[in-house]
């Protein structure tokens, strides 16, 4: 693929979509990871100073914030840090003590989504998500969290595409070379949770290749099907009532 042309076309598309909504820029999270880094680069090209990145730590690895700052400095991105630790602690404190770890972890991206929309409305911006196709198809996202956005520019691009785009866009090596992680807890990595690599996953999704992880991938796709659909509603014919 010609990733340089893809980045140009995607930048143009983002700008057109935001302007068609009569908005002037974009706000998005910068986590120190590669997806948000690629999104930040595209938005910076599209909007200049009207691209705003938010660093939103919640029990996060300090190295991730450091990497997010390195990215912002390298591309001249305007950014703000919003520390959500106290908000998270206050919310968790109102719940039962023996909560499921994942239920508590999923609060983090939902708090970030709320924060992004606050800044979007205050600035006349659109909320953009860095979710990619690999994560979307396996359900590796939080409903109404990192999937809560107005625009998902990377949703039809696989994780392996994101890595190639990062090289074209000049994302710092410290981000390109780190293991992808949702940062849900210390030491957590995407591929450890999956049980397979992004290369395996993307090859299977794109080419239906024969991989030893086929059954596991199919299971994740099936189990997460509900996450890719709008909430169902009761359908009825008024003439029957």
UniProtKB/Swiss-Prot annotation:
Question: Which GO terms of type biological process are on file?
Answer: NAD biosynthetic process
Annotated family: Belongs to the NAD synthetase family.
A molecular function GO annotation:
metal ion binding
InterPro entries linked: NAD/GMP_synthase, NAD_synthase, NH(3)-dep_NAD(+)_synth, Rossmann-like_a/b/a_fold
Write the record's keywords in alphabetical order, separated by commas. ATP-binding, Ligase, Magnesium, Metal-binding, NAD, Nucleotide-binding
Protein name, as recorded: NH(3)-dependent NAD(+) synthetase
Assembly and partners are described as:
Homodimer.
Q: Where does deamido-NAD(+) bind?
A: 110, 143, 150, 226-227
Keyword NAD recorded: yes
Q: What's the short name of a Pfam family annotated to this entry?
A: NAD_synthase
What this chain does, per the entry, is described as:
Catalyzes the ATP-dependent amidation of deamido-NAD to form NAD. Uses ammonia as a nitrogen source.
Record gene name: nadE
Q: Does the keyword Nucleotide-binding apply?
A: yes
Q: What CDD domains does this protein's entry cite?
A: NAD_synthase (cd00553)
Record-annotated residues binding Mg(2+)?
35, 135
Give the top-rank taxon of the lineage listed in the UniProt record for this protein: Bacteria
GO CC, one annotated term: cytoplasm
E.C. no: 6.3.1.5
Q: Cite the SUPFAM superfamilies for this sequence.
A: Adenine nucleotide alpha hydrolases-like
- UniProt-annotated binding residues for ATP: 29-36, 159, 181
